[in-house]
Amino acid sequence: ALKEEFEEHAEKAKTLPENTSSENKLTLYGLYKQATVGNV
């Protein structure tokens, strides 16, 4: 349920529009790492 939803959204994030700002990409990456690795 939750894990499948997370995986689905993680896949969608790989196809972001070209005009997505670096700041937004870094935010998404940080959230992804926090969800998969935890706080570092």
UniProtKB/Swiss-Prot annotation:
Pfam families for the chain: ACBP
InterPro entries: Acyl-CoA-binding_prot_CS, Acyl-CoA-binding_protein, Acyl-CoA-binding_sf, FERM/acyl-CoA-bd_prot_sf
Single GO molecular function: fatty-acyl-CoA binding
GO biological process: fatty acid metabolic process
Chain intervals for the UniProt region annotation (Disordered): 1-25
Annotated function: Binds medium- and long-chain acyl-CoA esters with very high affinity and may function as an intracellular carrier of acyl-CoA esters.
PANTHER family: ACYL-COA BINDING PROTEIN 1, ISOFORM A, ACYL-COA-BINDING PROTEIN, ACBP
Protein name: Acyl-CoA-binding protein 2
Bias (Basic and acidic residues) ranges: 1-15
Protein source organism: Digitalis lanata
Family statement: Belongs to the ACBP family.
Domain (ACB): residue spans on this chain: 2-40
Cellular component GO terms, alphabetical: cytoplasm
Alphabetized UniProt keyword annotations: Cytoplasm, Lipid-binding, Transport
